[in-house]
């Protein structure tokens, strides 16, 4: 007898033998169902349930349901490619945010015409309504099969799978692929998709491995969702931070310093405004700002454990045969050194240590993307050294600070991913229980919605990831808070407790922006370059109609500069219409236009970005109003 608990209905049913999802779901539900969650594991509807279990039904409206449909689409694309290009070898085809891809080994170079042909073939396969059939194979059977059809990459994948793990394949029509699953019942469940582009990719991400061709696609629940997504992509192209940065003269990146940013005056002004804003928030919230070296001995990275884990992504400097130095990829071990510089008491805790730390990571050139992925970056990094019983209160304070910062920067939709204990971890279960409880209570107290990310915490502690949504609905993971029981112990950090004994502090790794570079890229695209007045690199340009107004414009400018306004004057002999177009294209929020009449009447003509309307105002009134607006 098998007892099945339907979690959504809180109902228990008993069955005399093994059953599948199709057996236990009502026909009207099974039509909409994509898969089952069986004791936390995703199952195909056709897969047998062998023992007592708890189940949830996964439907298309669920994120997991959509992810499965995208996985289906990847397999359908692979089948289409094999039918059109029989010599192509299929390698891997996972789902990604908003879509999927599949990598192919083939001598032929895919073209846009090929993508159209593949799409057409995919529609035929979808219309054929092939069932996705799961089969468990012996290792030898799988190796023999894929070897016989010339799929050497599949054989390579099989060789890397532990022998204790079952090998599963999925069959759809005549196409068979190695896959863990799950899949929906049939190909006809894929209702709306589009192939997007072709790119190069190395096998297993190794630059020394074979070069493959990656076809990207997107799939959605219906055509309306697909069209919304495609329109969003068009809007994203218009907002591309690299294009806007060129128009606004913010920064550039060049081959002689790949992955590193050349900040121009306007861009660096924006950078400094953001840094000053964050610094003020940190001071008001009890953080002490520190500065640590960029170049640090290998010995420290070995003690911290980063040498083994991050060495491939570190820039190494050989000072001598006996001594290696590394440009720091993160700040945390250095902050522990400051903590260790003298003996701390429990009365000193918590200690909130912040740094705008310049870090470098040797990212592959193919992964670099404008400001969004760079090799040299500055983190708004901070570490809180505290006692275990302070984890909750410090997390509550951090969540409040993060919400405040995001809101003032224009992001009001925030969600949280909570990653709990992985299978391999340090520390005992009681400590993890307390840490996880402290984080969850803090998130709830902050009024933030959260999603469980089971088993994805670091080995040294659970973590929170804060995700914001931008103006066109895209999600960006920026903020983090990570509990660390291990690093303080590894690096010998301790404080003296109330009982006079030594204790290791808990270390909270936290960031709000993540990196300045990436966050500025997000801000540029969120606002499409039209920053709020307080954040804009240049807040005001005073432009003259005639040379006779030059002195007047300069006098006003000097007064405003003394008040901290980021103001410029345009005293060139160009036509005023040209000046307006120029500074409007540079996204300057406010223009003041002055000519003979304005000089005589001590007024200015005010024009706001995005408006063709000009309003006359006394200079004194305009200055007072501006000074109110430029402050956040």
UniProtKB/Swiss-Prot annotation:
Catalytic reactions of this protein: tRNA(Thr) + L-threonine + ATP = L-threonyl-tRNA(Thr) + AMP + diphosphate + H(+)
Region (Catalytic): 240-532
Gene Ontology molecular function, alphabetical: ATP binding; metal ion binding; threonine-tRNA ligase activity; tRNA binding
Keywords noted in UniProt: Aminoacyl-tRNA synthetase, ATP-binding, Cytoplasm, Ligase, Metal-binding, Nucleotide-binding, Protein biosynthesis, RNA-binding, tRNA-binding, Zinc
Listed name of the protein: Threonine--tRNA ligase
Free-text function comment from the UniProt entry: Catalyzes the attachment of threonine to tRNA(Thr) in a two-step reaction: L-threonine is first activated by ATP to form Thr-AMP and then transferred to the acceptor end of tRNA(Thr). Also edits incorrectly charged L-seryl-tRNA(Thr).
Xref: NCBIfam families: thrS
Keyword Metal-binding belongs to the record: yes
Cellular component per GO, a single term: cytoplasm
One Pfam family of this chain: tRNA-synt_2b
Catalytic EC class: ligase
Biological process terms in GO annotation: threonyl-tRNA aminoacylation
Assembly notes: Homodimer.
The enzyme's E.C. designation: 6.1.1.3
Cofactor details (free text): Binds 1 zinc ion per subunit.
Ranges where the TGS domain occurs: 1-59
Family: Belongs to the class-II aminoacyl-tRNA synthetase family.
Subcellular location: Cytoplasm
The species this protein was found in: Wolbachia sp. subsp. Brugia malayi (strain TRS)
Cofactor(s) in the UniProt record: Zn(2+)
Positions with a binding annotation for Zn(2+): 332, 383, 509
Chief location bin: cytoplasm
């Amino acid at each position: 007898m098998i007892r099945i608990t339907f979690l959504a209905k809180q109902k228990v049913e008993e069955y005399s033998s093994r059953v599948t999802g199709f057996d236990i779901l009502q026909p009207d539900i099974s039509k909409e169902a994509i898969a089952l969650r069986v004791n936390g594991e995703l199952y195909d509807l056709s897969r047998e349930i062998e023992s007592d279990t708890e189940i949830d039904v996964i439907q298309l409206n669920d994120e997991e349901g959509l992810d499965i449909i995208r996985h289906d689409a990847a397999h359908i694309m692979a089948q289409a490619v094999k039918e059109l290009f029989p010599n192509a070898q299929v390698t891997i085809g996972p789902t990604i945010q908003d879509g999927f891809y599949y990598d192919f080994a083939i001598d032929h170079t895919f073209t846009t015409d090929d993508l159209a042909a593949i799409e057409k073939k995919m529609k035929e396969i979808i219309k054929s309504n092939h069932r996705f059939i799961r089969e468990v194979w012996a290792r030898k059977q799988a190796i023999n099969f894929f070897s016989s059809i010339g799929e050497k990459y599949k054989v390579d994948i099989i060789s890397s799978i532990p022998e204790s793990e079952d090998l599963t394949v999925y069959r759809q029509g005549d196409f068979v692929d190695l896959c863990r699953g799950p899949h929906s019942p049939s190909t006809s469940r894929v209702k709306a998709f589009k192939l997007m582009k072709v790119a190069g990719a190395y096998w297993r991400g190794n630059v020394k491995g074979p070069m493959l061709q990656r076809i990207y696609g997107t799939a959605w629940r219906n055509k309306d969702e697909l069209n919304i997504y495609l329109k969003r992509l068009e809007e994203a192209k218009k907002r591309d931070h690299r294009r806007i940065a060129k128009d606004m003269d913010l920064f550039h990146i060049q081959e002689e310093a790949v992955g590193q940013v050349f900040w121009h005056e306007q861009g660096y002004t924006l950078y400094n405004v953001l840094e000053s804003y964050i610094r003020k928030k940190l001071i008001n919230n009890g953080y002490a700002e520190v500065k640590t070296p960029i170049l640090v001995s290998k010995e420290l990275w070995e003690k911290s454990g980063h040498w083994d884990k991050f060495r491939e992504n570190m820039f190494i400097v050989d000072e001598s045969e006996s001594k290696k130095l590394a440009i720091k990829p993160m700040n945390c071990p250095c902050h522990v050194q400051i903590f260790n510089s003298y003996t701390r008491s429990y009365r000193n805790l918590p200690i909130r240590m912040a740094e705008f730390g310049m870090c470098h990571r040797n990212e592959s050139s193919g992964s670099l993307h404008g400001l969004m992925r760079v090799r040299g970056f500055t983190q708004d990094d901070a570490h809180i050294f505290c006692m275990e019983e302070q984890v909750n209160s410090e997390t509550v304070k951090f969540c409040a600070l993060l919400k405040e910062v995001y809101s003032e920067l224009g992001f009001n939709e925030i969600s949280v991913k909570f990653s709990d204990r992985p299978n391999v971890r340090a520390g005992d279960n009681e400590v993890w229980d307390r840490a996880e409880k402290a984080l969850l209570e803090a998130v709830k107290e902050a009024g933030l919605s959260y999603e469980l990310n089971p088993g994805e915490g670091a080995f040294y502690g659970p973590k929170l990831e804060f995700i914001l949504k931008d103006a066109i609905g895209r999600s960006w993971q920026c903020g983090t808070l990570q509990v660390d029981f291990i690093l303080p112990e590894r690096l010998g950090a301790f404080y003296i407790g109330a009982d006079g004994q030594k204790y290791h502090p808990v270390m909270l790794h936290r960031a709000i922006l993540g990196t300045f570079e990436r966050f500025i890229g997000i801000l540029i695209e969120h606002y499409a370059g039209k920053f709020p007045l307080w954040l804009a690199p240049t807040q005001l340009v005073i432009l003259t109609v005639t040379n006779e107004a030059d002195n007047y414009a300069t006098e006003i400018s000097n007064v405003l500069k003394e008040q901290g306004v980021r103001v410029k004057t345009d005293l060139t002999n160009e036509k005023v219409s040209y000046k307006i177009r120029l500074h409007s294209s540079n996204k300057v929020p406010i223009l003041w236009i002055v000519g003979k009449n304005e000089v005589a009447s001590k007024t200015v003509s005010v024009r706001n970005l995005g408006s063709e309307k000009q309003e006359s105002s006394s200079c004194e009134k305009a200055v007072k109003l501006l000074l109110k607006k430029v402050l956040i």
